[in-house]
Amino acid sequence: MKKKHKRLLITSGIFCFLSCIVFFILTTLKENISFFYTVSEAIVLQNSQKLIRVGGMVVENSVIRSESEVIFQMTDFNKSVVVKYQGILPPMFSEKSGVVVQGKMFDNSTFLADTVFAKHDENYMPKVLKQIP
């Protein structure tokens, strides 16, 4: 085999190897990125039956608790959606606070949540630490 062909073969092999590495890195990063849709964007995705995350603010005086589920409204100050959730809410969940819910859009006004995440700003400090002088 000529030197020229050997060099071309080695260069092609290195290029293919590096391409595979970049592909696997990008695929892994895509799976680990946690983004969410706004309420307005999620309404457009109605009945997709795809697991999505939706972020917004809990509407004041909208939280209804029963023995089996919690129902509340979430808004992005443009549109609102009713969220139905069965489970224990995070301790920081409250009205007029930010939340991200994960689940499926049932119709253009109802979201069935599997998980509720309470959002907080960078100044958050747990109550236990606030009491320590």
UniProtKB/Swiss-Prot annotation:
Classification via InterPro entries: CcmE, CcmE-like_sf, NA-bd_OB-fold
> Which GO molecular function annotation, any one, does this entry have?
metal ion binding
Protein origin, superkingdom: Bacteria
Question: On the Cytoplasmic side, which residues?
Answer: 1-7
Q: What is its main location?
A: membrane
Q: Where in the cell is it found?
A: Cell inner membrane
Residues annotated as binding heme? 120, 124
Any one GO BP annotation for this protein: cytochrome complex assembly
Which regions of this chain are Periplasmic-facing, per the record's topological domains?
Answer: 29-133
The regions listed as transmembrane in this protein's record are 8-28
| Family classification | Belongs to the CcmE/CycJ family.
Output the HAMAP family linked to this UniProt entry.
CcmE (MF_01959)
The UniProt entry, under NCBIfam families, shows: PRK13254.1-1
What is the protein name for this chain? Cytochrome c-type biogenesis protein CcmE
